[in-house]
Amino acid sequence: MQPLFFVKRGAFVNNLGEEIKDWIVSIVIAVVLAMIIRNFLVAPYLVDGPSMMPTLQNQQRLVVNRLIYRLREPEKGEILIFQYPKDPSRDFIKRVIAVPGDTIEIKDGNVFVNDELQTEDYILSKCRGDYPRVKIPEGHIFVMGDNRNNSEDSRFPDVGFVPFELIKGKAMVVFWPLADMKALP
């Protein structure tokens, strides 16, 4: 009587070796793709602190588009992540208030861009103090936190005008906690 099937000695070992090799190649490809996506396309970020309240809450998690500002310049009203100029290991999240060529001035807590009073329905309260009228230089932006009285931003010398090369990306979506999920401007 002949067996229904027959396996050459060692065929199982060869197939197992091929299977392991296929798994390793698949894992390496997945890791490389994940690194490319995270470094060049999108990345998760954690909101650390109250400077963007009420728009963003402390400990919320965001998806940040890392590609967009390689294709175009930031626009007023966008929320972005940038590298803190005084400490490259820290990232800040703020709103773009003025772009290159704009003038900005803060009088009696009111923000004026190009001599126009800004309607800012996203802030907690007007900021204390004034800021002299200045023109935003080319290749830089002026940023502020939505929680004006609890934000280290372009009004302070340690941040100042943010150079384009320090911008890491545009905040697109709050994804955690799930109850707070929303798209950002």
Stretches found by the model and what they are:
Residues Q2-I20, V25, I36, F40-L46, ...:
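Soluble "head" domains of membrane/secretory-pathway proteins
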